[in-house]
């Protein structure tokens, strides 16, 4: 079976929804950021701090290659995976790519519960979210299906992901 690839900006629920979908479909779950952390032996925030974004993106590309070779997985990608077109090519080979998107204020509310968001360690995080969303918008167009999660529960999003996957997996 093809993989389900969840992509989108940080704080859109990729990991939470991905785990729920994986459980429902009896798939395995993998998070590319967690794979990067395992490869580096440190957190994403530490990688950014000690080695910079470019080094992180190299590790991320290796994680994407590894994850894309799997079968029957729900793959939650890091928010910036889309910035490298070769990542999309890899993930599409054996996956249906579903974009989870949300309004900036929803993203800010969701990520304010967590720390270790190196790209948002700025004075005005909502403004930075808007800038990054605008910058990434062209890259998000590659998705096979898009879900606006802003006003939906985790369960509703998971159900929509499953419906989209069933519809698109045979193409």
From Swiss-Prot:
GO CC, alphabetical: cytosol
Known pathway: Metabolic intermediate biosynthesis; chorismate biosynthesis; chorismate from D-erythrose 4-phosphate and phosphoenolpyruvate: step 5/7
Single biological process term from Gene Ontology: amino acid biosynthetic process
Annotated localization: Cytoplasm
EC nos: 2.7.1.71
Residues reported to bind ATP: 11-16, 117
Keywords carried by this UniProt record: Amino-acid biosynthesis, Aromatic amino acid biosynthesis, ATP-binding, Cytoplasm, Kinase, Magnesium, Metal-binding, Nucleotide-binding, Transferase
Name the record gives this protein: Shikimate kinase
Organism field: Caldanaerobacter subterraneus subsp. tengcongensis (strain DSM 15242 / JCM 11007 / NBRC 100824 / MB4) (Thermoanaerobacter tengcongensis)
